[in-house]
Amino acid sequence: MAESVERLQQRVQELERELAQERSLQVPRSGDGGGGRVRIEKMSSEVVDSNPYSRLMALKRMGIVSDYEKIRTFAVAIVGVGGVGSVTAEMLTRCGIGKLLLFDYDKVELANMNRLFFQPHQAGLSKVQAAEHTLRNINPDVLFEVHNYNITTVENFQHFMDRISNGGLEEGKPVDLVLSCVDNFEARMTINTACNELGQTWMESGVSENAVSGHIQLIIPGESACFACAPPLVVAANIDEKTLKREGVCAASLPTTMGVVAGILVQNVLKFLLNFGTVSFYLGYNAMQDFFPTMSMKPNPQCDDRNCRKQQEEYKKKVAALPKQEVIQEEEEIIHEDNEWGIELVSEVSEEELKNFSGPVPDLPEGITVAYTIPKKQEDSVTELTVEDSGESLEDLMAKMKNM
């Protein structure tokens, strides 16, 4: 009897887990009112509690963004829906992006719970399915397209390229931006290869294995350095990174660092898409010193990726074809704002005197003048003063001086 009760309790627990998974898989369609509301066709700046976009539209009123509603016209692909990618997807969803394409082959595990976004009851689901369900409930206005596969395989690579080149907001048009949020070099190089071949702008992000530093990088094929222009040592040495992993050893992971990296990544995405502020080509983050280094890297003319070299040549031709603008610098007159009486300083030395004291000016080409000349050497002339003898004695002269 006791065994039967125990089996029934186990069966109840199994059914409860299955029910939780089924509820997670019941993803509401766009416009079905995910999150308890219907789809909003047009963003409004009306300040009411029921408007999810009022705080975002305030950016336009404050002069930060000229047209925030334009964000609904963009499609962004996110490769890797882990600690950085899932938070990135959530932020873009809350910002009201037009469409998100999510790529990941992994499943949610309890070991992921130290990161952000995922919940324990989603364990066992694919990351893209779990993310889509949660994101649709946050904002049903966003369109989602999810792909549960590994982009590094030969079979899936062509499909991945097809979706980023034809999976835009309008079918047949490319996405506006690809975001790399993966945790291995093989996947980064795969994204780099695809984007170089298609001429697709993308942003790369990463967090260090000790979890206290990270970075983001904007890569415009031909204009800035691609991931293969200056690859990490593990890639340059052709080492199989799978051999670097050891049993029972994993990389450290902090939700704070991943949240910071995801935040600066999405901030850079918004500035790039909505054209405000300064877009960073490279921005690092060091949590130990709270240091944010920035830089820009030029592409390597000897890059191993032939498509990168091809994009560089096309970019040079594009720049050469631009009309050259001649910059004419006008000399500004010095204006003394506090000179009410029109007082002018006049030199006490005349031009003739200045010319006499100036040295010879060499014959120079047109447009070149000397800063100064060596003054002429003045000949020392000694003038002797003579006094005529008056014939008076010394006593007479002394007497005259006393009478003065």
UniProtKB/Swiss-Prot annotation:
GO process annotations (BP): erythrocyte differentiation; megakaryocyte differentiation; neuromuscular process; protein K69-linked ufmylation; protein ufmylation; regulation of intracellular estrogen receptor signaling pathway; regulation of type II interferon production; response to endoplasmic reticulum stress
Outcome after substituting residue 401 to R: Abolished interaction with UFC1
Residues engaged in binding ATP: 83, 104, 127, 150, 184
Annotated source species: Homo sapiens
Matching Pfam families: ThiF
MF GO annotations: ATP binding; protein homodimerization activity; UFM1 activating enzyme activity; zinc ion binding
Tissue distribution: Widely expressed.
Protein name according to UniProt: Ubiquitin-like modifier-activating enzyme 5
GO cellular component: cytoplasm; cytosol; endoplasmic reticulum membrane; Golgi apparatus; intracellular membrane-bounded organelle; nucleus
